[in-house]
């Protein structure tokens, strides 16, 4: 399993939400915990992209990013999580396609093909003894180099990932062995290392995966509950000006809900909000005329509370509306997208009374966010990476409910599958007229 380490640039086009965050210490802790869990379950963890792809604004799938930092900066920031992963004994490392002038002086030579980076730094200086992978060799960040598989092996990599033309790459490696540029011992050593990891991971004993019932085994009630709880725990209230949250339950007062994107994507939110307050739903369409935008702004201005629900990631078509949307009434922004998307409407978000980051628009998350707004559910998430000048790393306001609104069986050591069977028996008795209704007590 390939694990992206760290991102500190919110404009990073390729790592962004795949990283554990911005702070090197927190990233190291989370990577080690996650990777150790993988390896205890028989999955090799591979940390990437060495020596660090987080603070770049270029996608290495399309070009070669540059890390123009001093060695001191690399040691304290980019390299720190990798060093900790090595100390923890994690098994795999992927070298990225990056230009690191302070380590590799040859201009345009990617770190994945640099012996200074792969062997001298990773293997020798940092004493990494595990499997070393290249990033995909078909990527534009490395594609301009000839015989990339050969160069990667000579640099010290053990495995080359997705070379483009094996008919040319393999003969080039064989020719290099004949010329003494690579030794047979080099290749055999790499092969033994690969076979050793296969043995340690138990691949010799494991049978083929049984496809029958695979989906049910993977998506067990316990797994679904874990995913649900992780998603809900990530909900983050980024700010709460003048303690606008929690909102008061009041059916007499109507709150405006502005849905940015396909209105159907936030139906779960609207339905849950309607349990606590009267709701007037409005939809903002992409590329509306200024006349329609102003009419919508005027309509929203008549409400004392405005909730803006964003499920669309591409917000450029909506920028003309938000450029002039600074309502006098408190506006609460809900983002069911990765956090970096709010930077596209930064001015409007900066004026918001409250901002809640849900990360995804799953129905569970939408319902939980609605509950959080009315303090029917808790939220104590913290931002793992800063969002430009809007919010720093660690931003997060705690919302604590007075009384939990609902419960999930797995949270209390029960099985939802067993409870469904009990429900089925109870409902069957009602259908057959054995009793008009019933209550079930689980002891």
Region spans (language model):
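Second-shell residues forming the walls of enzyme active-site clefts
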Residues: 22-186, 193
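Preference for extracellular/luminal or secreted protein segments
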Residues: 124, 145-415
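Short glycine/proline- and charge-enriched loop/turn segments
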Residues: 13-19, 61-67, 352
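Short, conserved phosphate-binding/catalytic loop or strand-edge motifs used
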Residues: 3-14
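Short, basic/aromatic recognition patches
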Residues: 411-431
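Structural recognition of the beta-strand scaffold that forms the well-ordered cores
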Residues: 1-2, 44-49, 91-96, 130-134, ...
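A short, well-structured edge-of-sheet supersecondary motif
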Residues: 194, 427-443
């Amino acid at each position: 399993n390939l694990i992206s380490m760290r991102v500190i640039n919110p404009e990073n086009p390729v790592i962004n939400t795949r990283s554990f965050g911005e702070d090197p210490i927190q990233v190291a802790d989370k990577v080690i915990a996650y990777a150790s869990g993988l390896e205890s379950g028989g999955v090799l963890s591979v940390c990437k992209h060495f020596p660090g792809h987080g603070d770049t604004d270029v996608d290495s799938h399309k070009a070669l990013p540059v890390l123009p930092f001093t060695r001191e900066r690399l040691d304290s920031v980019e390299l720190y999580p990798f060093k900790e992963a090595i100390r923890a004994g994690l098994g795999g490392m992927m070298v990225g396609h990056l230009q690191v002038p302070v380590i590799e002086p040859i201009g345009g030579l990617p770190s994945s093909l640099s012996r200074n980076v792969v062997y001298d730094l990773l293997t020798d200086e940092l004493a990494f003894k595990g499997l070393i992978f290249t990033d995909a060799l078909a990527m534009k960040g490395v594609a301009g180099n000839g015989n990339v598989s050969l160069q990667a092996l000579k640099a010290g990599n053990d495995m080359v990932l997705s070379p483009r033309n094996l008919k040319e790459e393999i003969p080039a490696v064989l020719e290099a062995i004949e010329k003494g540029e690579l030794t047979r011992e080099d290749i055999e050593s790499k092969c033994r290392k690969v076979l050793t990891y296969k043995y340690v991971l138990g691949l010799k004993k494991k049978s083929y995966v049984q496809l029958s019932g695979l989906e049910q085994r993977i998506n067990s009630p316990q797994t679904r509950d874990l995913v649900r709880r992780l998603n809900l725990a990530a909900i983050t209230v980024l700010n709460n000006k003048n303690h606008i949250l929690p909102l008061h339950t009041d059916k007499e007062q109507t709150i405006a809900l502005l849905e940015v994107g396909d209105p159907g994507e936030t139906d779960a939110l609207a339905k849950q909000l309607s349990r606590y307050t009267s709701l007037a739903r409005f939809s903002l369409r992409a590329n509306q005329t200024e006349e329609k935008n102003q009419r919508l702004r005027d309509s929203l201005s008549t409400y004392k509370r405005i909730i803006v629900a964003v499920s669309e990631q591409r917000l450029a078509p909506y920028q003309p509306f938000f450029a002039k949307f600074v309502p006098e009434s408190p506006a609460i922004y809900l983002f069911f997208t990765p956090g970096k998307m709010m930077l596209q409407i930064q001015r409007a978000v900066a004026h918001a009374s409250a901002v809640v980051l849900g990360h995804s628009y799953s129905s569970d998350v939408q319902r939980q966010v609605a509950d959080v707004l009315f303090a029917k559910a808790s939220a104590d998430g913290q931002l793992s990476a800063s969002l430009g000048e809007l919010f720093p790393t660690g931003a997060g306001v705690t919302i604590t409910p007075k009384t939990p609104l609902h419960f999930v069986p797995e949270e209390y050591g029960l099985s939802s599958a067993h409870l469904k069977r009990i429900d089925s028996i109870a409902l069957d008795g009602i259908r057959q007229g054995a009793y008009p209704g019933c209550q079930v007590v689980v002891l």
